[in-house]
Amino acid sequence: METVTKNGYQNGSLESLCVNQRDPLSWGVAAEAMKGSHLDEVKRMVADYRKPVVKLGGETLTIAQVASIAGHDTGDVKVELSESARPGVKASSDWVMDSMDKGTDSYGVTTGFGATSHRRTKQGGALQKELIRFLNAGIFGNGTETCHTLPHSATRAAMLVRINTLLQGYSGIRFEILEAITRLLNNNITPCLPLRGTITASGDLVPLSYIAGLLTGRPNSKATGPTGEVLDAAEAFKAAGIESGFFELQPKEGLALVNGTAVGSGLASMVLFETNVLAVLSELLSAIFAEVMNGKPEFTDHLTHKLKHHPGQIEAAAIMEHILDGSAYMKAAKKLHETDPLQKPKQDRYALRTSPQWLGPQIEVIRFSTKSIEREINSVNDNPLIDVSRNKAIHGGNFQGTPIGVSMDNVRLAIASIGKLLFAQFSELVNDFYNNGLPSNLTASRNPSLDYGFKGAEIAMASYCSELQYLANPVTTHVQSAEQHNQDVNSLGLISSRKTAEAVDILKLMSTTFLVALCQAIDLRHLEENLKSAVKNTVSQVSKRVLTTGANGELHPSRFCEKELLKVVDREYVFAYVDDPCSATYPLMQKLRQVFVDHALENGENEKNFSTSVFQKIEAFEEELKALLPKEVESARAAYDSGNSAIDNKIKECRSYPLYKFVREELGTVLLTGEKVQSPGEEFDKVFTAMCQGKIIDPMLECLGEWNGSPLPIC
């Protein structure tokens, strides 16, 4: 099969450039790109992100590679240009110079720009110089408290994407300029670009003009060096090892540099890499939520989701099903539900039970948007396009960044929906009316009156969620006509990308807070199990000692109370009474006493005889219990605090363990209590920083390492 690269100059005929007869509208290519699971796609992204070299040829750049170059500013990931692209780039550059010599009238080469393209000039180089000058209209706010500079990671992403676009040989620019930008990237020299001022149609004119300004040595151009030092253009060139000196732009070259969507699509690529990771994390968090809530795993049953047909939902359910399959928490919950089916509602609430249905559409939106942006960063998106094969310049509008604006608006909606689910789950988790026995606010102190746990975190989560939902409002509905009504519709791609980057940051705050809360809940379930065991053993011990025999050693009717007394211990939530286990106002002692009362009522005539009265045993039982139980509870608590619990933590038997282990052991977070000095925010910061550094990825994928990509069989 013939392949076509670089404007028809290698390995292909002119005819094959025109129409792909097998897939003339490229829908087939788009559909093919969506095959396979989302998780597999995320794994491929991670592999791409970690490659030490990004080789650019114009057509195979991935969003993960863009994110990698953007995020690795220490020189450990390098950019290489494919030499096979050089002939095509040179041919289009030569064509522009030849057409200029012949007097051919071409937009941006011999004409003015935009609404003033009726003007004409033969001074092609001077025209490009003026283009860069008037586009340097950004504001940096130097000396003010507010920063108006684009983050250097986003600038690096833009530089990479612009090189990739120009390598395809349709733009009329010298290969040497692309090599110079590559040198800047590889030496971590980053031009300073304004944060605002682009509508991403005609591309990102204003910010990209500052890259061109640095290349041409404009006196107002600035860059940051490897350690954050501010450099002028000459210092930047020296630091990057560019020995050729500043570029005198030839006709069309200034336009080639600025008339593209690279800033918007570069930032969109960074955003989407993180969004895809956070989408998988949300599936894991939902599964762990089911574990600590004693949820019913049937919500993941494949038949339910197969009948709904949506692939995102099917995959989300299958991933949760895999995590919950064989989970020690699910086994314990199943036993609990079988023993006492009325202890909790028949069905879990929507935030748990419908989490696959909620997350599925968001994952589909994120996947589609990822592919859309990946097409954009491999597109030729300036104007005019130089078609050497037909000896003409084609005037069109590929600079219109609508795929960016629309994709980012849609992704922001998906992010807001994921955040809303996490907030709903978090709200259930910290509320003792809904969390199936966990303490209010997930408090872990001996004295709950001096520990309010995650109350502050819940307020913060409400704040995050509110801001996230506000950010979900579309940017693309706020288009203003620009540039003398020439740019009367425009994409606002970079603005939408920036808002989506904000949304991603907030979702990371929410994911961090929720993950730490889930680890707190896991530890509380562990503590709960050990405390309940201590209570149960003590009640059993006291029952045998006090209730088995009467005053004369004869068997006493109250001995039959023990079974029901132990059932009370099983049924009562430990954290509802454990701070003062023998208090008559707490449910444990009240329910234990009720057992005696019920048996006394059934004891008939024997109850009238002091020696066989069940009721008469209440005082002795309670006095013995009050003497022993507080000590046993404290002993169990002390053993837990010292890491010597009688019962091990169930999480170690679960597929979600790698994530818990990462948070607790690698990051060194602890069980939060009012008895310790650590604030919740200190622990959140540890996890948030690790999440921003990408350290969450490996433990997250380790949780899913055994998944074969399919739901469990329906049987």
Swiss-Prot record:
Its EC number is 4.3.1.24. It is found in: Cytoplasm. It comes from the Eukaryota. The modification 2,3-didehydroalanine (Ser) is found at residue 202. There is a cross-link at residues 201-203 (5-imidazolinone (Ala-Gly)). Pfam families: Lyase_aromatic (PF00221). PROSITE patterns: PAL_HISTIDASE. The active site is at residue 107. Pathway: Phenylpropanoid metabolism; trans-cinnamate biosynthesis; trans-cinnamate from L-phenylalanine: step 1/1. One of its GO terms (molecular function) is phenylalanine ammonia-lyase activity. It is an enzyme of class 4 (lyase). Its main location: cytoplasm. Homotetramer. This is a key enzyme of plant metabolism catalyzing the first reaction in the biosynthesis from L-phenylalanine of a wide variety of natural products based on the phenylpropane skeleton. PANTHER family: HISTIDINE AMMONIA-LYASE (PTHR10362). Belongs to the PAL/histidase family. This is Phenylalanine ammonia-lyase. It comes from Populus trichocarpa (Western balsam poplar).
